[in-house]
Amino acid sequence: MVNECVILADDPSALVELCGISTLERLLRTLQRCGIERATVLSSTPDPIAKELARPSWARAQLSLTLRTRQAGPVRLEQIVDLWPRSSDAIPLLLVIPAGSVFDPRLLRALVSQNAPTVLVDSGVGPRTQALTASAPDTSRGKLCGPALLEYDWASAQNGLLEEGLRNGLGHDSLAALDVSAQPLYYVSMCRKLRQFWFPAPSLSDKKLAERVLLDSIQKGPPDIPAWFHA
């Protein structure tokens, strides 16, 4: 089971609030629930990200966090390799995940349980979230959702942008694909069928749609006030 990760967190996408919680804070809470113990937060906008990380939060209090700064621009694979824990043999797989997106906890649990380098993709985005995921990059296996489990030997042999590396890895089968569309619909804890969801931080015009998706994921029927605050 993977227990370390690198979180890619930049303002403004990582600080978009949905149901009163930033996408970064929501991700940190989800990662703790998925068994992640240590996270390095890599940011080109460290000041606002540091301010968000400094907020007290019991829901991710057990998660050890380290903030690192990077140059502005697209994330490069070399930047990920530089952050790899010193003993790469002890950490064969590292989760790399963007904080500017929202993920169904079931998807992240499934991803961190993989035993080989794997990228989360979606070959058939559901109609409800098509507007929210339209900006996500396309690959030969479907939409690139963002999270990936990377192996040190693979990552250190690459050069260039992270997104291009993931796309090429999928195209050449050096990285496996975990397809959102192939995941079970039944949500055991909710006792209902619900397609597993993901989406980048929404624009202002799509914010209400994103919040409806989140609220629907935690209950049946119309949303109530307690659900709003715990979404």
Task: Kindly give the residue locations of the regions a language model identified.
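N-terminal glycine-rich phosphate-binding loop and ensuing alpha1 helix
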Residues: 1-50, 63
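Conserved core of the sugar-phosphate nucleotidyltransferase
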Residues: 53, 89-91, 101-181
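Structural motif
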Residues: 8-11, 41-46, 70-71, 96-101, ...
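Conserved beta-strand scaffold positions in the cores of enzyme catalytic domains, especially
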Residues: 15, 64-69, 74, 94, ...
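Left-handed beta-helix
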Residues: 1, 43-46, 101-103, 168-231
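Short acidic, S/G/P-rich loop/turn micro-motifs used as interaction or catalytic elements
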Residues: 11-15, 30, 46-48, 73, ...
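Surface-exposed alpha-helical segments enriched in charged/polar residues
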Residues: 29-33, 82-85, 109, 113
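Short phosphate-binding loop-to-helix
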Residues: 48-104
